[in-house]
Amino acid sequence: RKTKIAPTEKGLDELKRYMSGAFTPVSILYPTFNINVNLLDNDTLRHNFFRRAAEYLFRGLTFSKVLPEVGLFIDKDGGRMIMLYLYLQAIKNKTAYGAIIAYSASTLAKEFFVSRIHVNRIIKSAQEAGYLKDRGDGRMSIYPAFIELVENYAGLYFAYVTHYINVVPKERRHAVNMTSTL
């Protein structure tokens, strides 16, 4: 007896809402490819997308292995969102020396549904790694190393998504086609 599992409309809508955070930036990087989350409505495209993602995971190719320093954020509940939130605040106030931003562990805890203790542990780890400093006066110093870390993470993330979608930039198409015929 075979059991066939099929995604529900509600499940697909939630998947598309979640994946729009990846598809939208990639569509900006490759405007001629007409990339949008509605590609996930196509069973074959959706299957191939997740098959490629699974191949990376099964080979052990994770963010923490490729970019281990980002693990102090992304391996924690809400850590990825906290990292991105701090980055976006820092970019608004960026100087050559980093940025100084308003900071409240309580605000981050409420925003990302984690405890203040959890936020403080993430911040303490990031501070010990030299990415930022809680100034203790409601402000935080964000160092250039943190900004570089997040930008490296984002670049890797979008590279993964580009591969999962199977986008091959025009300048590589000819070379890819030639090697596949050899």
List the model feature ranges, each with a label.
Residues 1, 127-137:
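A short, conserved structural fragment
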Residues 1-7, 138-144:
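Minor-groove-contacting beta-hairpin "wing" of winged helix-turn-helix DNA-binding domains
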Residues 9-92, 99-111, 146-182:
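Intrinsic disorder/low-complexity detector
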Residues 113-127:
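Short amphipathic alpha-helical interaction segments
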